[in-house]
Amino acid sequence: DAVVKTIDIQGVDALLVKKGTAAQVAWADEIQQIYIVIDGPIDQTEDLIKIARNLTVS
């Protein structure tokens, strides 16, 4: 079973999902009408969160 948690990414509620050896951060940008997913190995979860918090989409 996956472990799902809500975290803040750029002022938006995002999902942090962990299952097995994988982790994923996902959220929607309603202004640009896009859905963003960043995934990687579970041991790099903190790095994935840092990337998500600093991501700029234009």
Q: Over which residues does each language-model region extend?
A:
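Short, solvent-exposed recognition patches
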Residues: D1-I31
